[in-house]
Amino acid sequence: MISVGQYSKLKVSKKVDFGYYLEDNFGDEVLLPNSAAKGHEIKEGDQLEVFIYRDSKDRMISTLKKPLLTVGEIGYLEVVSQNNIGAFVNFGLERDLFVPLKEQSYKLKEGKKYLFYMYVDKTDRLAATTRIHSYLDIAEEGKYKVSDEVNAIVYEINENATLNVAIDGEYRGLILANEHFEYIYPGQEIKGRVKRIYEDGTIGVTTRKKRLEARSELSETILNYLKENGGFMPYNDKSSPEDIKREFNTSKNYFKMTLGGLMREKLITQDKEGTRLL
């Protein structure tokens, strides 16, 4: 049986002006257009592995080109257009992949990339959804360990600001609200490290740098700020957490510890107005 969204190994049954007809063991045929066979020498009787999809006229056709994902897989794809019924994303073939409006769990933007799961809808057409959570795997025991560096892509932001992320594009992970500081949006790629592994196998990730590295970077940031502003800044260890996060993108606790370290090194002093460079 020839199925949309999958690879099939088919035999070339005949050549026509506009392409080749391929058939399976049951005699079912599908067209391989000339445009989808460019660069390949093909003759009758050849066995070809082709991807099956529907063209703009809704006809089932095949191609030797490799799509970015097949049915049942998750891919990181770019949105190429959006209208009042849905969006279209590039999955590597001539025809773009449709994402119905009801399958968009957040607003998609043209030119941005997001994670999508591809499926076949009730009309036997290819479609995609941003609702990928149930299709992500749980990492097997031992695949990741605490402190491992990982690549993550955000696919959901919860009301408490916890981020659901896909680790390496296929495993379930999360980043708690206190483990990230910057504004993060769906589809964003993040580099982090494993902080813990939950009982259900979900990977807990942090974007925080290791303490010494983070404090060293923050010290440099504070000193540069002071040098660029005449040796003074209107922030000290009494400043509000909101002001500190807005200006230095860090927590008040880290800010206070870093100021304390700079004072011990006799590089700065604090007063009620702020902090001064020595």
Cite the ranges covered by each PLM segment.
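Single-stranded RNA-binding regions, centering on S1/OB-family and related RNA-binding modules
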Residues: M1-L278
